[in-house]
């Protein structure tokens, strides 16, 4: 079996470009070479990527892909052969059309009859030919975020390509890209193998020697190994100063893809800068310098770890350079901080009028006002009484957007608002809510902890979703420029994970009515006039969108799709209750009799005609079985309804299970679809009563068993 190596040598690739190439190769290679792998194993594909090289090694490759046998059928035998046994014009035309030699024609029998046909053998391609055909196209289609041209060939790539290694075992498989011929020569580390910064040009004799040559050339090609080297050094330096590293996964990924041979250098900064909020120092180090911080007992210490792409001779000189650059950045941050503290946060509130939220949705001040109206309605629904602090937090929630610190570091919005509010004497819960109203920022981010923060977060996200859907700006499959999908996921997570019992439909109806009072959306091109865009007609679209995010969230949690659909099909408005219902049915599925239970429940639902209107009269019941079923229904429904009201869905389902023997007995002994119309409709009405009870939890007909 053979191995194949591809290495594309480039000028310095951006970290995201390295990520893109690695992901792309991992997605494409297995399918592309599936006919050449001798067997499936994780060892077949080894992808690597650094700032100066991307590529892969394929193992367990066949010399040649398997031949394919294909049978082609032509006209029926009675049409393709004449009385003398010769092929007719129809058979000859079939052979000519498919480039089949006449001598290969034969009669082929199948279940449909006898036909003229042929069995063709398609020879498998040689691995070398296949590589020459597909690899140039594979390289060309790497979906880099940005592309550039650099020579007369017009080839586009993330950065200029400088060399290509293409080896099948010890043999060069030639092709050309961007005017460069594939060969067996690579370049080693730029600074640690030559003084010129070009890197030693090195011959790769065969695929098996590649990683050893890289190691000797001070290169760690594999992303995972390089990342582990960064983490090991980070932990080691932390231990040496008796501290804990502040590990940021995004920074870890970025530093990994900025280096081929990461070397950590421990530095210091003046303790005077510790007057700055912790998040400011961490952000300055991360965004501007790609430095890691350390802390003791949850507090930052004045040290950092930078990573060089080379082992340096004069470590103190390099360390001093890192420290000087960081000092300048921290000095700027301290200036911003002190300037911001000269103003009360509330002073910035009127200036929010000057920040456009969206040209159809008014200013950031308009949004804050809308958020406040929604927060009031939410507090009413959830019996939250501290309106004074809620509205105070809402008023201050976006004010830090006007501060110098947030203008410089937009990722600190909310965080700086919290710190400035605390400095200026605001209540702790009010200050914390300014930060928390942005949470969660991602699908796995932390949730707001305070009640005010939770209400403001929901209000802010609801306004964003409502507003953009109302003006027709729903996200596309691959683009969500206004964060509607992200905000919807945030709404789902807050309601479900914090156990908030909220009827979204009722809330949206309340907001719609309130919109007519506060003029929730402004018409952009008429300065003094307003247009009511959000009304009840938009509510189903908004609910459908949020429901879609809820369904995806439930699937990610491991719940069965059919169970999820059975619940949301009868009520998609209260996400927390729906979660509890789904969880309870999923638990019930562990019952060995689940299939039998569902069969009975589904039979009740399926026997009722569509659009059937229930007109039940207990006096019309005739047989003992239907009378017993009705008595059991009235008994169960009383307890069941109370359990549902109190969100005790497991107990409610257990009540429903008590119906099963009575339903079985009813179907075994009572003819529902009798010719007597009065009896038939009364029995169907009884079924509908029972099914309506079932549907307070789910539409069991949608559950597959």
From Swiss-Prot:
NCBIfam families: glyS (TIGR00211). It is found in: Cytoplasm. It comes from Persephonella marina (strain DSM 14350 / EX-H1). One of its GO terms (biological process) is arginyl-tRNA aminoacylation. Its EC number is 6.1.1.14. This is Glycine--tRNA ligase beta subunit. Disulfide bonds: none annotated. The gene is glyS. It holds the Pfam family DALR_1.
């Amino acid at each position: 079996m053979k191995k194949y190596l591809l290495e594309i040598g480039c000028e310095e690739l951006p970290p995201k470009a390295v990520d893109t190439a690695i992901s792309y190769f991992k997605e494409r290679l297995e399918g592309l070479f599936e006919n050449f792998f001798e067997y499936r194993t994780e060892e077949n594909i080894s992808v690597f990527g650094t700032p100066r090289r991307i590529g892969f090694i394929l193992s367990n490759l066949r010399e040649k892909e398997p031949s394919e046998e294909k049978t082609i059928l032509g006209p029926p035998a009675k049409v393709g052969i004449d009385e003398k046994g010769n092929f007719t014009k129809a058979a000859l035309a079939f052979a000519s059309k498919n480039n089949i030699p006449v001598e290969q024609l034969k009669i082929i029998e199948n279940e449909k009859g006898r036909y003229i046909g042929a069995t063709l053998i398609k020879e498998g391609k040689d691995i070398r030919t296949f590589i020459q055909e597909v690899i140039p196209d594979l390289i060309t289609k790497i979906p880099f975020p940005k592309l550039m041209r650099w020579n007369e060939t017009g080839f586009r790539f993330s950065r200029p390509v400088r060399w290509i290694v293409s080896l099948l075992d010890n043999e060069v498989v030639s092709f050309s890209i961007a005017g460069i011929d594939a060969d067996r020569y690579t370049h080693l580390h730029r600074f640690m193998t030559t003084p010129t910064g070009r890197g030693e040009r090195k011959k790769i004799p065969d695929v098996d020697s590649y990683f050893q040559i890289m190691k000797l050339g001070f290169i760690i090609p594999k992303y995972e190994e390089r990342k582990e080297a960064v983490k090991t050094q980070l932990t080691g330096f932390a231990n040496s100063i008796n501290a804990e590293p502040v590990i940021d996964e995004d920074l870890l990924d970025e530093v990994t893809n900025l280096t081929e041979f990461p070397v950590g250098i421990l530095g210091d900064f003046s303790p005077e800068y510790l007057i700055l909020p912790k998040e400011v120092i961490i952000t300055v180090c991360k965004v501007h310098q790609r430095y890691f911080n350390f802390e003791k007992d949850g507090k930052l210490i004045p040290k950092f770890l930078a990573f060089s792409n080379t082992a340096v001779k004069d470590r103190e000189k390099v360390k001093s350079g890192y420290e000087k650059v960081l000092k300048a950045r921290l000095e700027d941050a301290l200036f911003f901080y002190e300037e911001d503290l000269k103003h009360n946060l509330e002073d910035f509130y009127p200036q929010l009028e000057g920040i456009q939220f969206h040209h159809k949705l008014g200013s950031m001040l308009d949004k804050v006002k809308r958020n406040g109206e929604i927060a009031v309605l939410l507090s009413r629904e959830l019996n939250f009484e501290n309106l004074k602090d809620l509205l105070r937090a809402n008023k201050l929630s976006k004010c830090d957007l006007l501060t110098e610190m947030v203008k410089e570091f937009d990722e600190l919005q909310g965080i700086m608002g919290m710190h400035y509010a605390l400095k200026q004497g605001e209540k702790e819960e009010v200050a914390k809510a300014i930060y928390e109203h942005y949470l969660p920022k991602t699908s796995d981010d932390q949730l707001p902890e305070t009640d005010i923060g939770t209400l403001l977060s929901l209000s802010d996200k609801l306004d964003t979703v409502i507003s953009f859907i109302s003006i027709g700006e729903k996200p596309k499959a691959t683009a969500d420029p206004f964060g509607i999908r992200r905000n919807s996921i945030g709404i789902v997570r807050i309601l479900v994970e914090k156990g908030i019992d909220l009827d979204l439909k009722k809330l949206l109806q309340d907001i719609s009515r309130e919109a007519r009072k506060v003029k929730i959306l402004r018409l952009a091109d008429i300065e003094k006039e307003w247009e009511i865009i959000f009304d009840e007609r938009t509510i189903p679209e908004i609910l459908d969108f949020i429901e879609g995010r809820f369904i995806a969230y439930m699937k990610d949690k491991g719940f069965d799709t059919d169970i999820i659909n059975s619940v949301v099909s009868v009520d998609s408005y209260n996400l927390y209750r729906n979660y509890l219902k789904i969880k309870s049915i999923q638990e019930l599925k562990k019952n060995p009799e689940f299939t039998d239970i569902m069969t009975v429940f589904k039979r009740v639902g399926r026997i009722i005609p569509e659009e059937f209107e229930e007109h039940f009269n207990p006096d019309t019941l005739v047989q003992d079985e239907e009378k017993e079923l009705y008595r059991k229904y009235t008994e169960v429904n009383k307890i069941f309804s109370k359990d549902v009201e109190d969100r005790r869905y497991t107990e409610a389902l257990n009540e429903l299970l008590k119906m099963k023997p009575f339903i079985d007995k009813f179907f075994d002994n009572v003819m529902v679809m009798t010719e007597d119309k009065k009896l038939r409709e009364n029995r169907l009405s009884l079924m509908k009563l029972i099914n309506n009870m079932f549907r307070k939890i789910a539409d069991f007909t949608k559950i597959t068993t």
